[in-house]
Amino acid sequence: MSRSIHKGPFIDVSLLKRIEALNISGKKEVLKTWSRASTIIPDMVGHTIAVYNGKQHFPVFVSDQMVGHKLGEFVPTRTFRTHVKGDRKARR
């Protein structure tokens, strides 16, 4: 179920303020955030946002195609470790 149109997209207030400040100043710096649920808006395009995955911050460069998606979609939280095939000869 999608979010109601009259509410608008969810964006963390502190993240929105920092994005607006960067747009006014014209600086390019990496913003750290823990808000994986924030929706990417057109103001964020061209910025690099370091999103927390539960262990460390991963830098995400925001492009046009990402608008409307959540920040957490681009940072995996789980690492897949392949199943090691057992060495049967060593067990004997």
UniProtKB/Swiss-Prot annotation:
It is found in: Plastid, Chloroplast. Keywords: Chloroplast, Plastid, Ribonucleoprotein, Ribosomal protein, RNA-binding, rRNA-binding. One of its GO terms (cellular component) is mitochondrial small ribosomal subunit. GO terms for biological process: ribosomal small subunit assembly; translation. Pfam families: Ribosomal_S19. GO terms for molecular function: rRNA binding; structural constituent of ribosome. Gene3D superfamilies: 30s Ribosomal Protein S19, Chain A. PANTHER family: RIBOSOMAL PROTEIN S19P FAMILY MEMBER, SMALL RIBOSOMAL SUBUNIT PROTEIN US19M. Belongs to the universal ribosomal protein uS19 family. Protein S19 forms a complex with S13 that binds strongly to the 16S ribosomal RNA. This is Small ribosomal subunit protein uS19c. It comes from Pyropia yezoensis (Susabi-nori).
